[in-house]
Design a protein with these regions (language model features):
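Outer-membrane beta-barrel biogenesis signature
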Residues: 19-37, 45
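Transmembrane beta-barrel strands of outer-membrane/channel proteins
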Residues: 34-42, 88-94, 150-158, 205, ...
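Internal, conserved structured core segments that host functional sites
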Residues: 135-162
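Post-signal peptide N-terminal segment of secreted/secretory-pathway proteins
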Residues: 73-77, 81, 85-87, 93
Length: 317
């Protein structure tokens, strides 16, 4: 089913442009542009745990926050003909970046709105994050000073975190928030990875006035496949959790503004907002201490949103 959806969205621009006259494909310098930029990545990713036996209520949530991680971003686009373009783009962090993680549990079913256990981990690292994007565009309007087109593509993104040390407030069986303490500094507490795979559709356009140019791109997917891996390193509770969620929604808006310093070279700034909305999925766990495993349907939730700002150079060959 996923392959069928991907085939549909990837052929959409070709179908739209079928009214156009056939052009001979030619790999010439006039058909290619490339850009490179530097910037920052900020955002938050969330993992949730639900109990099906208690009506699917949320019993745990971990929020991983990161700010101003340095990234490098690049793209290349090839105009196959006046109505069709193909492109590849991607970005990656240039190193790890400090962040923060908060882990909360709601274990009292008689008072589900009040957390019973919480740990905070200010010594958290975004180890890495990256993304690649392959796309095709069908131009409905393609004039020297403005363009408007539909697009479709495939995109993957990855995030990796490690939380160390920190403090906790737990509730004992007899009390409420009565167990207070801290973890050893530098000791690994939790490692977490997320991965998002998605075919998408979108709308893109640009407008140029003299040497100034403004561009906007909107992307949407209802077919996101998300997966994660959560490693709890506590020797007394050494557990691995793995979750998968299908058919999540993804939204992205990108706005850029640039100035042509030469007929072929443009400097620009760009801001991109991305979000994958939360949805329940299946989860499994493996207890390394007693070698047991378990599986829960609709026992997990995965969510991510981030904002990217960059400044760079685009060159048309």
């Amino acid at each position: 089913m996923r392959a069928k959806l991907l085939g549909i969205v990837l052929t959409t621009p070709i179908a739209i442009s079928s009214f156009a006259s056939t052009e001979t494909l030619s790999f010439t310098p006039d058909n290619i542009n490339a850009d490179i930029s530097l910037g920052t990545l900020s955002g938050k990713t969330k993992e949730r745990v639900y109990l099906a036996e208690e009506g699917g209520r949320k019993v745990s949530q971990l929020d991983w926050k990161f700010n101003n991680a340095a990234i490098i971003k690049g793209a290349i686009n090839w105009d196959l003909m006046p109505q069709i373009s193909i492109g590849a783009a991607g970005w990656t962090t240039l190193g790890s970046r400090g962040g923060n993680m908060v882990d909360q549990d709601w274990m009292d079913s008689s008072n589900p709105g009040t957390w019973t256990d919480e740990s905070r981990h200010p010594d958290t690292q975004l180890n890495y994050a990256n993304e690649f994007d392959l796309n095709i565009k069908g131009w409905l309007l393609n004039e020297p000073n403005y363009r408007l087109g539909l697009m479709a593509g495939y995109q993957e993104s990855r995030y990796s975190f490690t939380a160390r040390g920190g403090s906790y407030i737990y509730s004992s069986e007899e009390g409420f928030r009565d167990d207070i303490g801290s973890f050893p500094n530098g000791e690994r507490a939790i490692g977490y990875k997320q991965r998002f795979k998605m075919p998408y559709i979108g709308l893109t356009g640009s407008y140029r006035y003299e040497d100034f140019e403004l561009g906007v791109t909107f992307k949407y997917s209802g077919w996101v496949e998300a997966s994660d891996n959560d490693e709890h390193y506590d020797p007394g509770k050494r557990i691995t959790y793995r979750s998968k969620v299908k058919d999540q929604n993804y939204y992205s808006v990108s706005v850029n503004a640039g100035y042509y310093v030469t007929p072929n070279a443009k400097v620009y700034v760009e801001g991109t907002w991305n979000r994958v909305t939360n949805k329940k999925g299946n989860t499994s766990l493996y207890d390394h201490n007693d070698n047991t495993s378990d599986y829960s349907k609709n026992g997990a939730g995965i969510e991510n949103y981030n904002f990217i700002t960059t400044a760079g150079l685009k060159y048309t060959f």
